[in-house]
Every structure is written in C-alpha cells, then in structure tokens.
C-alpha cells in the first residue's frame, strides 16, 4: 500500500489520530534543517518583492482625517501631531511602512506609547519596537502583559497592529503560518503529514517560563515528554506557570513551508496576497489582460490590499481619534491615470455635472478661474 493510501486510510478510520498516522518512528524523528529567522525568509526575491510592494503602497497613501456628518465624510483638520508624525522624527509614511512589513513578516507590529494627549488620553508618540525583542505574556489566548527588551508594559501602553487573526487568540499570524494552519486537511491527504509534522524538531514559537522555579528529577521525564510531544508536531511548547510568546524565530518546518509544498513563484504570490505580474512573475493563466495599468491596480486594490487598508483605518480611528472622527487612507492614489485617461475622465465628470471645473482644477493644484481666464474662455467659445 502506498504512503498516500495508508495516510488516507488512517485519516478516514473511526479513531484516526495524528499519532496513529505518524507512527512511533515519526515520534522521535529529528530534523537536520537549521532554524531560520523571518529575516532569512526575505531572501526569497518574490516574497521580498511582494512584502515591499504592499508596504510601499500602504505607507504612501495620503491620510485624511474626516468626520461623519449624516451620510458624508467631511474633511477636518487633524486633532494632533500623531497622524502626521507618530513619533519624533518618524513620519507617518515611515511608520506605516515599518508596521506593514512587520505584519507581513510576523503577523504583528508593536510599539510603546510614550506620550498621550491631556484631553482624551489618545496616543501622541508611539515608538515602534524590533519584533525580535518583543514577547507577549499571555493567559490562554489573552495578552496580560508585553515585554519589550527587558521591560514589561501593560496592554494599554502598547500600540498593537495585527493581521491574519484566528478566533480565541489575541495575536496575529504571518501569512505562511496562517496558510499552513488552514491547509491541514489537504496536507495530510497529499502525504504532507509525514514531512511536515514529523520533520520539524523545533517549536514554531517558544513560550518561556518567567518563574524562577527549577525542574527537579521527579519532573524531568514529564518535561521531556511534553517537549518531545510539542516539538514533534511543530506546535507550541508550553512550560512553566507563566509563559511568553516570542515571534522572532520559526522552525525549519514553518519557514520551509514553501519548499515542502514545492510551491511555485505563483503560489508565493498567493500566500503574500500580491498579483504575480506585479512582482515580475508569470501568472501562468495566459488569458488575463487589462486595458490599462489602472484596471490592474484596481483589481489589486479590491481583491488583495483593500481589506487590510480598511482594518488599518479602523484601528487608527479607534485608538488615535475621538468619535465621530476617523482616519481615511486615500486609495485613489493607487489608481493614478495616464494623462490622456485623466483628461477624458475630467471631461466626463464635468459634462455629467459630477464635478465642477473648480473641483477638477484642484486635482492639478490649480485655483479657480480668474477674471482674465474666464474672459479668454468666452472668447474661444465665441470663435467656435
């Protein structure tokens, strides 16, 4: 019987379990692959290009502060410096680039709130942290404390953006971990279990005991069995009364997900959420064409980038602004037209009375017509 057939038989058995699928040999199988970090994952050029593309776009969208009045969003002056400069000498563009890169690599972006407004207690200065120095002290799926370097902080003193979330866990996941989690059934059916679950000898995430307790001889075997059980499946290893979540390093099994899946460059683009053609990869379909660059960008915005932008707007609005004010990222900047297309659109908007000439001129940083310009336009109209 082939390995695939045997895996399928065990999976469909009444009392099927992962242990019976792997067998005793897998229980003690060791991985010779090295532990890699999220930085080394960026060596993959397609992964790097996709991450940078997403971060570049999100960080350069113009930021507007608006107030909801009836059915309209009315622009209002920013209530403070935080929207334009979240930390001294750190612009909004730089801040958003860093947080987007961290979210795509770790699933989380963390900063320490160093200063708050006197009125409303909203953040005025947030110092982003290197994720390799960040830990989350947790009680079940709830964050009770953050550790940044050697210092501990209450959750209210932390700016925490996240993506790829799952129910019951207050932390986000990186795209590969999220994909690996949700592809479990497919992985087993394709004989993935024997390579994925048995091949990783290190935990995906380390949970460190923060108590000074020592393990005595009577508990050594129990601790050894627990460690072997967790690391065998690439799962989280829990030890001690209190523990800390550390996201900076992942096991070879997690970081090698693309290689184990024999993923193509197109698959990498699917994991990161970027159309293949935008990072120089052949899409492989051969039949998807766009009339212009704008249509391609629109598809990317709607299908890939838009949802994360909406979540970012919601978080910033909830954490940094009083109600009913909220943050809007002007995603129209992604849909910049070529000169001819822009001119045609302006003519149509004016003819359909959707925009006035003054509003359209503002898009080119031009003021309203002055008296001489109006007279000149009248002369041209008279000449036909």
Features from the language model and the residues they span:
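Structured, contiguous alpha/beta core segments that scaffold functional sites
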Residues: 1-257, 261-263, 267-270, 274, ...
């Amino acid at each position: 019987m082939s390995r695939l057939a045997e895996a399928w038989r065990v999976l469909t058995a009444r009392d099927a379990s992962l242990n019976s699928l792997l067998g005793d040999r897998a229980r003690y199988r060791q991985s010779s692959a090295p532990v890699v970090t999220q930085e080394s994952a960026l060596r993959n050029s397609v992964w790097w290009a996709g991450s940078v593309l997403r971060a570049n776009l999100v960080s350069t969208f113009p930021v507007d502060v608006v107030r909801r009045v009836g059915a309209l969003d009315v622009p209002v002056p920013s209530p403070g410096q935080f929207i334009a400069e979240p930390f001294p000498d750190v612009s909004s563009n730089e801040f958003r680039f860093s947080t987007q890169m961290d979210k795509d690599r770790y699933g989380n972006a963390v900063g320490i709130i160093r200063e708050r407004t006197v009125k409303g207690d909203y953040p005025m200065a947030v110092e982003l942290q290197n994720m390799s120095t960040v830990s989350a002290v947790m009680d079940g799926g709830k964050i009770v404390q953050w550790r940044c370097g050697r210092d501990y902080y209450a959750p209210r003193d932390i700016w925490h953006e996240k993506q790829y979330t799952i129910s019951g866990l207050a932390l986000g996941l990186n795209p590969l971990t999220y994909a690996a989690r949700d592809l479990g059934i497919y992985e087993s059916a394709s004989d993935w279990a024997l390579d994925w679950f048995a091949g990783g000898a290190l935990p995906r995430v380390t949970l460190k005991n923060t108590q000074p307790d020592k393990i005595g001889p009577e508990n050594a075997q129990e601790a050894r069995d627990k460690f072997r059980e967790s690391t065998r499946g690439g799962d989280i290893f829990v030890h001690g009364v209190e523990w800390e979540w550390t996201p900076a390093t992942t096991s070879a099994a997690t970081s090698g997900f693309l290689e184990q899946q024999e993923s193509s460059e197109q698959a990498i683009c699917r994991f990161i959420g970027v159309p293949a053609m935008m990072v120089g990869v052949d899409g492989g379909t051969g039949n998807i064409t766009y009339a212009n660059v704008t249509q391609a960008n629109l598809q990317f915005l709607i299908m890939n980038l838009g949802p994360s932008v909406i979540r970012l707007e919601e978080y910033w609005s909830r954490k940094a602004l009083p109600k009913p004010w909220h943050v809007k990222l002007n995603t129209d900047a992604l849909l910049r037209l070529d000169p001819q297309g822009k001119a045609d659109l302006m003519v149509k908007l004016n003819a359909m009375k959707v925009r006035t000439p003054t509003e359209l001129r503002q898009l080119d940083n031009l003021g309203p017509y002055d008296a001489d310009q109006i007279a000149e336009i009248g002369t041209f109209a008279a000449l036909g």
